[in-house]
């Protein structure tokens, strides 16, 4: 896996904190920083997600992918899946994630709660490299609801 991240500044001015990531699979992702009122030249313009937001989003994508795949392989009638991630970070540098809660909503027909619980556990214990890495610094908790469709 590879990725190239380039500083773009704000709208090409080279004065902000905008970045573009180009992935090895040919996709592009924009990132930006929060505005800094005390030093505007060092802040972003809030035009794109912050880098750590992309880490959190990537973790959500990784685990949701696993959960859907595991449920489908178990021949469950899964029709939708979303995960809402909330987090806390350390107050001092490096501001690593210290707590992450993942709340899954799985939509389908006749999906047993035990199957969803198992899929989430398998993702977090075996398959989702992102959540396994973040679990080294953060306490990760999960919850789920099943919506009958």
Predicted regions and their residues:
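Extended beta-strand/beta-hairpin segments
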Residues: 1-57, 68-149
């Amino acid at each position: 896996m590879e990725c190239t991240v380039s500083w773009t500044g704000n709208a090409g001015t080279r004065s902000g904190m905008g970045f573009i990531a180009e992935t090895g699979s040919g996709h592009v992702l924009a990132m930006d920083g929060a505005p800094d009122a005390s030093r505007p030249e060092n802040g972003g313009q809030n035009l794109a997600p912050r880098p750590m937001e992309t880490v959190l989003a990537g973790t959500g994508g990784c685990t949701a992918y696993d959960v859907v795949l595991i449920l489908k392989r178990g021949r469950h009638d899964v029709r939708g899946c979303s995960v809402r991630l909330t987090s806390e970070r350390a107050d001092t540098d490096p501001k690593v994630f210290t707590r992450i809660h993942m709340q899954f909503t799985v939509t389908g027909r006749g999906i047993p709660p035990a199957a969803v619980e198992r899929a989430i556990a398998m993702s977090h214990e075996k398959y989702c490299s992102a959540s396994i890495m973040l679990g080294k610094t953060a306490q990760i908790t999960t919850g789920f609801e099943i919506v009958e469709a």
